[in-house]
Amino acid sequence: MATSVMSSLSLKPSSFGVDTKSAVKGLPSLSRSSASFTVRASGVKKIKVDKPLGIGGGMKLRDGVDSSGRKPTGKGVYQFVDKYGANVDGYSPIYNEEEWAPTGDVYAGGTTGLLIWAVTLAGLLAGGALLVYNTSALAQ
């Protein structure tokens, strides 16, 4: 049945056509022009470097001090030692000396902690070995 339907249809050129010569009002022409297109710079813009920006140059400070009441030092950013009096770790340490163990002879986790650590390590090693075995030719 499909072949009879397809054979009864004949593909004819459509009577609907677009006349490329006539232009429609209000629409731009789609034809390409043969004129070449060039880009030219308008001129060279010089950067002024005689007076630098920042605290040493372009920043206007009221009464000669910044918002924290300090006079400018000529640097654009604060230095941690000058601003805080110490390195950042002096005020926000990542460790606390009171939490340290008095000696390193005894593990703080005890026997249970060591057993959990050993089982985790053995599981990771066994899992890795199983992955290597399953992806190798030995598993075939």
UniProtKB/Swiss-Prot annotation:
Superkingdom of source: Eukaryota
Biological process according to GO: photosynthesis
Keywords: Chloroplast, Membrane, Photosynthesis, Photosystem II, Plastid, Thylakoid, Transit peptide
Transit peptide: 1-41
Keyword field contains Membrane: yes
Localisation per UniProt entry: Plastid, Chloroplast thylakoid membrane
Location (main, coarse): plastid
Family membership: Belongs to the psbR family.
Function: Associated with the oxygen-evolving complex of photosystem II.
Name of protein: Photosystem II 10 kDa polypeptide, chloroplastic
Organism: Spinacia oleracea (Spinach)
